[in-house]
């Protein structure tokens, strides 16, 4: 029995695709002329490391009738919808609309999570959760870098990202792995990732009670990972405190070289 237009349109929904996306078409990569389910499948399979430009895709192959054709949401041969979500700018298809895709004009790509839940930060150059609006430290193009833990490019990564207090970014999964290994400072700038006030007050009290004068070894120089100030302090075994901002997030450095 021949399917009506509505049945034909929805035929095979969520039944085709790859590990990255549910879709009823494959794309022809203009860079190498090979066929892949998506750009991620292409990027994972190339031996020379070249990546597919999503905006350059010109033709797709319907997975229902195997017809190659120009990029469009509906197959012109069999009438099947090749992706319930379709972006003509990104040449992007996905049947899983629960992911709440939206296209950000400023980012120039499609994102997931619902347009109302995100805003585009002009300085950081990416979409962030509305919970971070006016509540994050801006770093220019902070998302257009590799994750400092796994080194995957963050801007168009499929994995969720986390914005640290200092403004640097990493994958949320990598952030949790870092905590499991008792790493509590940014791997890029060494600023603490949590509010350390309570811990530092306790450290001050411990130093005051147990380390008075007994372990002074002259003077030395420290650099503060919070305010970046370099100061000279009494050298201790532990607990060097920044004279500028009172932080203990410091490390020993060589004495500065004074001009002749």
Curated annotation (Swiss-Prot):
Record gene name: SRFP1
- Identify which top EC class this enzyme belongs to: transferase
CHY-type zinc finger segments: 11-80
The UniProt annotation places Zn(2+) 5 binding at 104, 107, 120, 127
Q: Where does Zn(2+) 4 bind?
A: 87, 90, 103, 110
Task: Report residues binding Zn(2+) 2.
Answer: 31-32, 42, 50
Give the source species.
Oryza sativa subsp. japonica
Name the UniProt record assigns to this protein: E3 ubiquitin-protein ligase SRFP1
- What positions does the entry give for Zn(2+) 6 binding? 121, 124, 136, 138
Q: Which UniProt keywords apply?
A: Cytoplasm, Metal-binding, Nucleus, Stress response, Transferase, Ubl conjugation pathway, Zinc, Zinc-finger
């Amino acid at each position: 029995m021949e399917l009506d237009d509505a049945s034909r349109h929805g035929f095979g929904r969520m039944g085709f695709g790859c590990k990255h996306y549910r879709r009823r078409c494959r794309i022809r990569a203009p860079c190498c002329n090979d066929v892949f389910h998506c750009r991620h499948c292409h990027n994972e399979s190339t031996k020379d490391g070249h990546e597919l430009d999503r905006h350059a895709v010109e033709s797709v192959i319907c997975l229902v009738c195997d017809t190659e054709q120009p990029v469009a949401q509906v197959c012109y041969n069999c009438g099947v919808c090749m992706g319930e979500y379709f972006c003509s700018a990104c040449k992007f298809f996905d049947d899983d609309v629960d992911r709440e895709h939206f296209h950000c004009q400023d980012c120039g790509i499609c994102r997931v999570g619902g347009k109302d839940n995100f805003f585009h930060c002009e300085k950081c150059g990416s979409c962030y959760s509305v919970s971070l609006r006016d509540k994050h430290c801006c770093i220019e193009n902070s998302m257009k870098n590799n994750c400092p833990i796994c080194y995957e490019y963050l801007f168009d990564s499929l994995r969720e990202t986390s914005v640290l207090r200092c403004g640097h970014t990493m994958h949320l999964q990598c952030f949790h792995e870092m905590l499991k290994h008792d790493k509590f400072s940014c791997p890029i700038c060494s600023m603490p990732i949590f509010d350390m006030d309570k811990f530092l007050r306790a450290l001050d009290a411990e130093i005051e009670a147990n380390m008075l004068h007994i372990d002074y070894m002259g003077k030395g120089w420290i650099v503060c990972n919070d305010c970046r100030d370099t100061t000279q302090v009494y050298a201790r075994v532990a607990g060097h405190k920044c004279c500028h901002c009172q932080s203990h997030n410091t490390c020993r450095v060589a004495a500065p070289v004074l001009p002749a």
